[in-house]
């Protein structure tokens, strides 16, 4: 396991890492113990497999979002916002979780911002200000970068295109391996869902990520708003765990709920008869459809809310396997209700939030399912977060 001999200079104040980088093994044991205690009412400890450590434990993140921030006195920072009260902007100059060149991009953006004092940082509670976030995504095929600048879409805080183009030129003149640059305008209004207007400024429309399972490699095109697991090597371990848990014969139909860009379904497609993917985010569905063609996968994807899809298909014969990888908030009660009516033989529940996961697994157990195996996988070293893969099987039909 890779050792870290020093802590990041921002440790303890930025809110990113909750345990010292020099104490990874200790933090891993603490996560494992907490998970055992949490799930002990539902599954014997011998069915919980040892946590799979993160590898690498440093600079493995393929995505990082940085926030623009300013105080009431006008002091401006670009980096993270501390969890302390009152909140503080932390001008990040080092981060051991991501490629060092991401910090270079941060610095070039700071320099550009300094030449435009008229641009204020966005303040979400009042929906005021111009500059929201800077997102850096890194592809593992060519180790190249996608940069996304998010600004306010409100007319009174709009950033002129000419100013955005100055930022673009600053980045391109840096010599960094930037594959694509996007500008997003955040359209937010009271009592309305937040949407984004995206402008492609430079380069490719997507970033390339590669995942390999048992010697089979797939290439995935990831767009600005597509979800992709934040640690590519850990994503492979998640998918391998799912494959091992379901023990496919090649004759199964697998429903992949919250399928995102199709990473799980496409990776599993050689092992089952058919994959059906369901995803609500149009950008992710576009990526999934592109990735299906790119990898010649036997998968069909639907642009639909998981709850609506399950409700429409609740009276069909029981599916063989359902894989759910929902947001941190979980499936929610109604979606879970319709999933239960579909009565799949096996359910794989992947979650980055064990608290939500155990709540919904408890409901599944109450309705005839049993937890058979559990595999925790560390995706966020030096934090309290832990990815968890659970196999549930229906006891009777």
From Swiss-Prot:
The residue range of the signal peptide is none
Give the GO biological process terms: rRNA base methylation
Q: Which PROSITE patterns would you find in this protein's record? A: SAM_MT_RNA_M5U (PS51687), TRMA_1 (PS01230), TRMA_2 (PS01231)
* Primary enzyme class: transferase
Stored SUPFAM superfamilies: S-adenosyl-L-methionine-dependent methyltransferases (SSF53335)
InterPro entries in the cross-refs: MeTrfase_TrmA_AS, MeTrfase_TrmA_CS, SAM-dependent_MTases_sf, U5_MeTrfase_fam
Q: What is its EC number?
A: 2.1.1.-
One example GO MF annotation: rRNA (uridine-C5-)-methyltransferase activity
Q: Which domain of life is it from?
A: Bacteria
Q: Where is the active site?
A: 352
Residue positions binding [4Fe-4S] cluster: 8, 14, 17, 95
UniProt keyword Ribosomal protein present: no
Q: Which UniProt keywords apply?
A: 4Fe-4S, Iron, Iron-sulfur, Metal-binding, Methyltransferase, S-adenosyl-L-methionine, Transferase
Residues where S-adenosyl-L-methionine binds: 229, 258, 279, 325
Family to which this protein belongs: Belongs to the class I-like SAM-binding methyltransferase superfamily. RNA M5U methyltransferase family.
Any idea what this protein is called?
Uncharacterized RNA methyltransferase TC_0118
Q: Which organism is it from?
A: Chlamydia muridarum (strain MoPn / Nigg)
Organism ancestry: Bacteria, Pseudomonadati, Chlamydiota, Chlamydiia, Chlamydiales
